Structures are given as structure tokens and as C-alpha cells.
A protein has these predicted regions:
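Walker A/P-loop nucleotide-binding motif
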Residues: 124-144
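Walker B catalytic acidic pair
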Residues: 194-195
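Pre-Walker A (pre-P-loop) alpha-helix and adjacent loop at the N terminus of AAA/AAA+ ATPase modules
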Residues: 88-91, 96-130
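A short, basic N-terminal segment
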Residues: 1-104, 267-280
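Residue-level preference for the first positions of well-ordered beta-strands
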Residues: 127-131, 158, 189, 221
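Short glycine-rich substrate-engagement loop in P-loop NTPases that contacts/grips substrate
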Residues: 108-117, 148-189, 199-206
Length: 280
């Protein structure tokens, strides 16, 4: 047993020299590259404990190599975390490509979306959400996806979904409605895309209200995209819609999206590319 302990202590206090290393005038081993010591002397009282007068020290080369290894490991863990967040956070893999880097820069609200992300801690503390409203194809969903991607790159969990999927999940959920909604509300940011497109049954409207009301009570920000107009939201057709819209407008700052229909432009560009391929 004593021999085993001595062997462990020997490994702990020994330094393995490289061919270019050398012994300095102080008797310590030095790195042949950076000329810094790879050993240091124990204090006299410690030397008696370990049976040696010196222990390994980190030269500049070793320090640089260690820092590079640590940085690579930190980067790997970060990428793994972001990958898991995006796997859980997006309901459509295509949303991963909805990033500020891929944005064409033509949407006038892109600056607002970027600033929201930059000031996320303030937005979260003050519970400030956004309601992106406007015509079809004006980039509402895309910019919401950009915000989600940017926040997840900062390792902030975000969930982007829509009520069509939520209602289907609730109908098929084995964990129970309350637990499912609670899970949605645990995300620091929840994004509800294409609001107003879900079926308007009494059951559907009740579940929509339950989700939005639960999010309201959680005190966490909500971002909503919708093709409904602000007038539609402020003048609902009935009580069921009124209490839903009232909650939304109390949680989210309305942001209007105007301009060209980017989807039509994309479709036109694809058509022109296809024609060119066919005719060439």
C-alpha cells in the first residue's frame, strides 16, 4: 500500500521533459521553446510531505495548449447546447435558417427585432412582448424566427409554434392539458406564429385563451405574429375573442409590418429560374 501511495505521489510531482527542454541554473526544468520553467520548488514544509523538493509548473506553451483545449471544449459544449435548444424549440427544421445573417435587409422592422434581442434581459425583466401584425408575406414569421435563433445562440431557451400544432398536441397529449401548457410557459420566450389561423370552435377558442392566459400569468414575454389587423384585435366580434385579444394587447407591443410580399417574390424568382433551366 505504501509503495502504491509513493507511486501516486511520484506521478503527481514528476515532470516529463521534452527533448528540447533543459535544466536551468536554479536546477529546475525549463521549456526549450518558451524558456519558462516547467517546475517549481515546494516550500520547505511541503517537500517533507511529498518526499520531493519540486513539483510540475505550467510553462507558457503548456498554458496556451491548455487554454486552447478548454476553449475548444467550451465551444463544443456550446454547440451541443444550441443544437438541443433548436431541436426542442422549433416545430419546423426550416426555421433554423431564419437568421439575421440570412436576412435580405429589406424589412424595415429588422432593426427593431435585432434591438429586442440585444436588450433581451430588459425585455424579460419588464415582460415586454411584441405583436407582429400585417399582410401576408411581409416577413413577420421570418423575423420572429431570427429572434428565436439569435436568442438560442445565446443559450436562451425559446419555443416557436402555432395554435394549430398546440391544439393537436393537446388533443393527443398523455401528460394532461395543464402540464402541457405549463411546459410551454416555462420557456423564457414563447413565440406563437400565425395567430388567428386556428379553427374557431368553442373548444379551440377556450384552449387558445388558456394558453395565452397562462402565459400572461407566468410573467414571461410573448411574441405573436398574425395577419389580423390592429382594428380586428381592438374590435373583436364576440366575447370569446374579446378576452383573448385583450390579453394579447396587454402583453405585446403592436408592430406593423408593411411592404412587399416576400413570398410572392420568392415564388416569382423560383419560376424564373425554372424557366431559364428549361429553355437553356
Amino acid at each position: 500500500m505504501k509503495n502504491e501511495i509513493n507511486a501516486v505521489l511520484e506521478n503527481m510531482t514528476a515532470t516529463t521533459p521534452e527533448p528540447e527542454d533543459y535544466t536551468g541554473e536554479d536546477g529546475l526544468l525549463y521549456c526549450g521553446k518558451c524558456r519558462k520553467p516547467k517546475e517549481a520548488y515546494f516550500a520547505p514544509d511541503k517537500a517533507a510531505i511529498f518526499g520531493r523538493d519540486r513539483h510540475p509548473a505550467e510553462c507558457d506553451c503548456q498554458k496556451t495548449a491548455r487554454e486552447e483545449r478548454e476553449a475548444a471544449e467550451k465551444r463544443r459544449r456550446h454547440l451541443d447546447t444550441v443544437e438541443e435548444l433548436k431541436r426542442r424549440g422549433f416545430t419546423d427544421p426550416a426555421m433554423r435558417d431564419w437568421t439575421f445573417e440570412n436576412d435580405n435587409g429589406r424589412n424595415p422592422q429588422a432593426g427593431l427585432a435585432r434591438r429586442y434581442v440585444e436588450h433581451w434581459e430588459d425585455m424579460r425583466t419588464d415582460n415586454i412582448g411584441c405583436l407582429f401584425w400585417g399582410g401576408v408575406g411581409t416577413g413577420k414569421s421570418y423575423l420572429a424566427g431570427c429572434m428565436a435563433n439569435a436568442l438560442m445562440e445565446k443559450e436562451i431557451p425559446v419555443h416557436m409554434t402555432n395554435f394549430a400544432l398546440i391544439l393537436n398536441d393537446l388533443a393527443a397529449s398523455f401528460e394532461g392539458r395543464n402540464e402541457y401548457i405549463s411546459r410551454l410557459c416555462r420557456y423564457p420566450l414563447l413565440i406563437l406564429d400565425d395567430f388567428g389561423m386556428e379553427r374557431g370552435t368553442d373548444y379551440g377558442l377556450e384552449q387558445v385563451f388558456n394558453v395565452i392566459d397562462s402565459r400572461y400569468r407566468s410573467g414571461k414575454p410573448l411574441i405573436v405574429t398574425t395577419n389580423l389587423t390592429l382594428d380586428d384585435l381592438r374590435n373583436p366580434e364576440d366575447t370569446a375573442h374579446s378576452r383573448i385579444y385583450d390579453r394579447l394587447l396587454s402583453m405585446c407591443v403592436p408592430v406593423r409590418f408593411t411592404g412587399d410580399n416576400f413570398r410572392q417574390e420568392t415564388a416569382k424568382r423560383k419560376m424564373e429560374s425554372m424557366k431559364k433551366l428549361i429553355t437553356d
